[in-house]
């Protein structure tokens, strides 16, 4: 697999002063799959903020000592990051903290603004000074600007949403309140729950609620603003129903953890269904079905059930390294495949194998996995992909930045099969995507090129940071 989502957000608001940093720590641990470059936690203790942020995994950044650095409090917001806008630097670690005339706030954001550069230009012209190359800081400053002329932080967020374009699921913590907001399309997931002691928990995925013992309440609606305070939860829906829901379909195929439920749809069931559809559309005469860990496993199970071909564990994942897109260079990605996956020879040797994976982007990772299976003695390899071919860039928070890097833009399915070294290849048909979520309310722009929002003609993943670097005279 060679694709990555960008972030996970987590927030907790307790009814009493306690170790909210510890709760946030476990919540971020459950969201680690959404971002592995950096992480951070900001704690609010009666309006006094303390924070710790750094590059690395949750287990690397936080220890007993670093958690002890964070005071007890009644609120905390946390973030795990994989950068799709802005570089991998400590300055870009989230949550972003801002002090302003009416108070302070900490902001954690999952998504990608398509108009970030334009907003930043306007803010700089009005005197704003930026310290990062992340679009999250842009959101923070837009909210801050509105906060100076509005009576409440929730009013400021609502006003700011009129200016924001693209994907954003965010958690904002002020001195006295916590805000959860989701863009009007609902591109990225966001939900909340409640713990037995009354504490509220907000997270990118429901799996993080379960990890801290919170009971799922519901998803944040597209366009909705939830205000958590001493009075409870207030819902503001002035931005709801402005657009048709367009949740990213790839959340179900790959990004989300299989035990999560997004907008009422089980991620695990979606993946099993994808495998069943593949078996119906691209059957194979084979001896065993295996999945590429982790997101290919449920689809492999579905293919096995629908085809009657036995399911087996043919690839073992080393769980102590990050996903392959964490490495910036192609050679590093290849090296990570070698240490990340190991074939089970006695399962594969002499067998005709159906290999299930969630996608092919460049083809680099798939080619190496196929080579591993050949070396383990696979007689035939029939690869099935639980998503349609990637043909277009994503501008809503996924690391697919240009068509030049997408193998399906340059080669036919037969040519791709030859390039990666498989005997046959089949993709999930585009027209069957709706069966994964039993709805048409999803974004599949990376597959069909139909973008729900207006996209600047020169927009690329690196456009935001590239333009800023040019201004600052930084060599790229």
Where do the language-model regions lie?
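PRPP-dependent phosphoribosyltransferase catalytic core
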Residues: 161, 176, 213-215, 219, ...
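Extended, hydrophobic alpha-helical segments in both membrane/secreted and soluble proteins
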Residues: 289, 296-303, 307, 311, ...
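A conserved beta-strand->alpha-helix junction
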Residues: 132, 137-141, 311-322, 419-437
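Flexible loop/turn segments at secondary-structure boundaries
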Residues: 84-85, 115, 187-188, 209-210, ...
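Secondary-structure transition/capping motifs at alpha-helix termini
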Residues: 128, 149-150, 283-287, 305-312, ...
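Conserved short alpha-helical segments that host acidic/polar catalytic motifs at enzyme active sites
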Residues: 1-222, 227-286, 292, 380, ...
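Short, glycine/charge-rich flexible loops or terminal/linker lids adjacent to PRPP-binding catalytic cores
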Residues: 308-353, 364, 391-397, 401
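A glycine-rich phosphate-binding loop feature that marks nucleotide/adenosyl-phosphate handling sites
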Residues: 44-47, 175-177, 291-299, 306, ...
């Amino acid at each position: 697999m060679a694709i990555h989502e960008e972030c996970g957000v987590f927030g907790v608001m307790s009814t009493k002063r306690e170790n909210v940093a510890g709760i946030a720590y476990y919540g971020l641990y459950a969201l680690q799959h959404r971002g592995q470059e950096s992480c951070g936690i900001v704690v609010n203790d009666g309006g006094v903020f303390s924070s710790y942020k750094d590059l690395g995994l949750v287990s690397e950044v936080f220890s007993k000592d670093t958690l002890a650095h964070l005071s007890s409090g009644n609120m905390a917001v946390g973030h795990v990051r994989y950068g799709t806008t802005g570089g991998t630097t400590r300055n870009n670690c989230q949550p972003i903290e801002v002090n302003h005339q009416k108070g302070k706030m900490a902001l954690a954001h999952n998504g990608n603004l398509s108009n970030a550069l334009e907003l930043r230009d306007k803010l700089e012209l009005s005197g704003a000074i930026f310290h990062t190359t992340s679009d999250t800081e842009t959101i923070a400053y837009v909210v801050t600007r509105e906060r100076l002329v509005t009576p409440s932080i929730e009013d400021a967020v609502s006003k700011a949403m009129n200016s924001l374009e693209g994907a954003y699921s965010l958690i904002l913590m002020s001195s006295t309140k916590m805000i959860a907001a989701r863009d009007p399309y609902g591109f990225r997931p966001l939900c909340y729950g409640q713990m037995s002691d009354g504490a509220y928990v907000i997270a990118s995925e429901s799996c993080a609620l379960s990890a801290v013992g919170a009971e799922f309440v519901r998803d944040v609606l597209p366009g909705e603003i939830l205000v958590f305070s001493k009075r409870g939860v207030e819902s503001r829906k002035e931005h709801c129903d402005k657009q048709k829901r367009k949740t990213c379909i790839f959340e179900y195929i790959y990004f989300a953890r299989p035990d999560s439920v997004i907008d009422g749809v089980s991620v695990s069931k979606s993946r099993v269904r994808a495998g069943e559809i593949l078996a119906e559309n691209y059957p194979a005469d084979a001896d065993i079905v295996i999945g590429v860990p982790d997101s290919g496993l449920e689809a492999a199970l579905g293919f096995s059930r629908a085809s009657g071909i036995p399911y087996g564990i043919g690839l073992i994942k080393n769980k102590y390294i990050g996903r392959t897109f964490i490495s910036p260079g192609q050679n590093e990605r290849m090296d990570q495949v070698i240490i990340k996956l190991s074939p089970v020879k006695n399962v594969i040797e002499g067998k005709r194998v159906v290999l299930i994976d969630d996608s092919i982007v460049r083809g680099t990772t798939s080619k190496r996995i196929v080579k591993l299976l050949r070396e383990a003695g696979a007689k035939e390899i029939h690869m099935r992909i639980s998503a349609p071919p990637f043909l277009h860039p994503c501008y809503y928070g996924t690391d697919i930045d240009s068509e030049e890097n997408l193998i399906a833009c340059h080669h036919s399915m037969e040519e791709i099969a030859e390039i990666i070294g498989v005997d046959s290849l089949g993709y999930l048909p585009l027209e069957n995507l709706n069966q994964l979520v039993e709805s048409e309310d999803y974004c599949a722009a990376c597959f069909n090129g139909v973008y729900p929002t207006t996209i600047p003609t020169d927009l690329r993943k690196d456009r935001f940071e590239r333009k800023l670097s040019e201004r600052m005279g930084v060599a790229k």
